[in-house]
Structures are given as structure tokens and as C-alpha cells.
């Protein structure tokens, strides 16, 4: 068997490119790829820089699902507002959590929304406080700090909003269903010595009203509450 060792490039009787021509073509392709990559990177940076919005205030409202509230009450579990959060009233049947910082980019919608205040879950002599809520829009979750532990857990999973409005200095997300995560269910069951909580439990419906448009740079203005 004869082994062919001669390159087809520039071989007699073939129409292949010469080595210098091939090198020139390869260099041109590399240059085009570099230019394309640079343009894509620049466009991406422009897209994020031009549409990233630092938040200056606002609030997130959480209305507890009626069936879930009844189940918690029947089991002797109380849910209370802590810190800067406000508890439901007859006129305002929802918990209110002030927005104290964060940054959001418009398209696609993403970023972080930072809150003050929190919730205390208690049963008998056991209790646990979750606070410093952060909505992570890119992951569609709400994380929380567990008081006294320094641990931050993924507390809630967020459904797609029924409506989104951006303008007039506000970002409004309406009709966001929130469900307990497996991690949060385990933490609550352990802290309260119960087996009541389960991942996927519908907690309720949230409405986010975030403000922007002043000199605030989206920095968190509350150290801890």
C-alpha cells in the first residue's frame, strides 16, 4: 500500500490554494471573527448600560393565600411582620415590605430588588425570622436572611407576572404567584418542630412597585432590619 505524503495544496493538476493564499484567507477570517466578537460585546454592554435602572424606593405587597392562611391558623402557626415591614389590615389585606435598593435592567427584565423588614413564623415556643428579602428577577426567586444564623436561603419561587409596566418612574409587576421552596420548607419545619410546610406550597400573590428616577444609585440604604 502506498502512503500519500504530498500535500494537495499546490499539487500539480489540482485547483487547491497555494500556502500563502491559504494563510491570507485564514488571517482574514480571524480578523472578521474578532471584529464580529468586538461588535457583539459592545452592543451587549450598550444594551445593559443603557437600560439598567437603579432603584430608589417603592414597596412589595404580599397577600397570603386564603387556604394557606387557614391551614397555618388551624395548625397554630402565626405569621407576623418584623422590622420595617407592615402587617395586613382590614383596608390593606397584605404584608408590605419597603424597597431599599437594587438595580433592574429592562429588556430582558432582570436584576435585583432589595427590601427591608421581614416575617416571623412562630408556633408554641418556637419561632424563626426571615428578613432582608431580595428578589432576583433573573432566577425568579426571593432569597431571605435567616435571623441569628447569617444564612441566606432561597425562600420563595416566583411565577411569571400577570402584568408588567415600566414608565413614569416606576416598575410594576402584578399578579406574581409565590410558592415556598423545598429549602425553605425544610428550614421552617425544623425551626418550628412541625411537618406542616412543603415545597411548592402556594404562599400567596405579590405585587412589586419599584421606584426609580432620582439621584439614588440603587445602593442598599439599610444595614439590617
Where on the chain are the PLM-derived regions?
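N-terminal secretory signal peptides that target proteins for export/translocation
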Residues: 1-21
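An N-terminal domain-start capping segment
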Residues: 13, 24-26, 121
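Bacterial N-terminal signal peptides
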Residues: 24-38
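N-terminal segment immediately downstream of the Sec signal-peptide cleavage site
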Residues: 43-108, 177-218
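Predominantly extracellular/secreted and cell-surface proteins with exposed
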Residues: 82-158
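Generic beta-strand hydrophobic packing signal
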Residues: 119, 131-133, 169, 176, ...
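Extended amphipathic ligand-handling, pore-lining, and cofactor/metal-binding catalytic surfaces
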Residues: 149-185
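Short, solvent-exposed mixed-charge patches
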Residues: 222-225
